[in-house]
Amino acid sequence: MTEVTILGAGGNMGRRITRTLRENPQYTLRLVEPGERGRSLIEESGLQVVDQAEGLAGTDVVVFAVPDKIVRGIAAEVIPLLESSTSVLFLDPAAVAADRVPRRDDISCFVTHPTHPPLYSLLGEEDPAARRDYWGGGLATQAIVFAVAWGDEGQAALVENLAIAMFEPVSQSYRITVDQMALLEPALTETLTNGCIAVIREGMDRVVAAGVPEEATRQFLMGHLQIGIALIFEQFDWRLSEGAQLALARSREQIFRDDWHRIFEPEAVLDSLKQITGGD
């Protein structure tokens, strides 16, 4: 049986992974949560909170389920206290990729993150509730990415299996590097994708403000979002109309800077990671 300590167990992600792991006989959980509300939520679920010293003593894996802005300080406090051969698992690449985590060669460090249920995969879910599990709260199937920051490859298999168990149901675990994960998040998803989506929402609000009925605007936009994504990501054998292709070409000139792809350059990614984890 593997002893797993979850730091930040009372937060959203901490409670999500605890719900799955508590049912798995391969793992014994030690739940660490300093916040009063978080502790109450854990206790209301029928589980017990332990203090940090008890949670860390002799544990096999420490999971950092804490916000990006404070993970740097918590890692600096916790990692020096760990026994040799302990593994640590971060649920986001930011702190590790930005070199915010103290390195100890006698422990192993890993990073994982869920893909969240892919857009068109939700259509294949039989349970109506699973079809609306956009975040990946335990109903809809999703994949994960997993990286070895440093350490023992033998430990990697154990911790990767833990990561899969955390985010079940999981279709696949993709082994990538920490730097590659940072290209996925924040660069590709949080910076580019969410930035584009936020502008789309702003565009919808402007159309409504111009007098188009809100429900008609929303329905029209949601339908065209779905077909646009399906066409551009080649979900079926069809093409954008000539008019749509012309509008798409013009959008490059009117909306996007010529150097927008600079967000993927190493220095831009590092700058974003540093901001996410509390600045310089």
What positions do the PLM features span?
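Rossmann-fold NAD(P) dinucleotide-binding segment
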Residues: 53-102
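NAD(P)-dependent Rossmann-like dehydrogenase/reductase catalytic/cofactor-binding core
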Residues: 140-141, 212-280
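Rossmann-fold dinucleotide-binding core
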Residues: 91-184
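Short acidic-hydrophobic, aromatic-tinged amphipathic segments that line or gate anion-handling sites
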Residues: 48-54, 175
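An accessory alpha-helical subdomain
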Residues: 177-228, 245-249
